[in-house]
Amino acid sequence: MKIIKEIISWMTYILTAFVIAMLINVFVFQQSFVEGHSMEPTLQDNDKVFVSKLINIYHHELEYGDIVIIDSQIELPRTIVDDVKESVENNLITNILFGTEKEEKFWIKRVIGKAGDIIEFRDDKVIRNGEILSEPYIKEQANYMSVKKFVVPENHVFVMGDNRNNSRDSRSIGSVPLNHIIGKYKFRY
């Protein structure tokens, strides 16, 4: 009987630790990694990054130049259930026990435009609200084929990769709803 109580006690501790880890992963921070070359030279393929999710809790406004993780499936609604499901699927314990399946729906990009901004591309330059952006972080001179204008709707941001000639971003999927921002990049390790 004592052994059963000991096992139940240990299982309770393990379950409690798992629940706390899940809550932290859903609401506070998570680790992620860069897959691909779209954020070079700022971030490299396979860089591990620390992502703060506090912007979602405190509704902090994103700033121009912030690097964010987005859910690129902007045509689908996103809820807290998605955050919990992804936390269960993408945590260390699940990865050790079952391996990982890489999903390409999460992208890491830089905020270029916020609600109400007009984003244009002319003469291989990004223009926000009539002003050419100074972008020392981009990999190389970009070749923009379009002279299309984008107006960023309310509760959305316009994001782009730093490697402009090798990036799928708001130029192809449109502005990203704020509820599709998973978190804000803090540092790599």
List where the protein language model places each region:
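Extended hydrophobic leader/signal-anchor segments used for secretion and membrane insertion
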Residues: M1-Y189
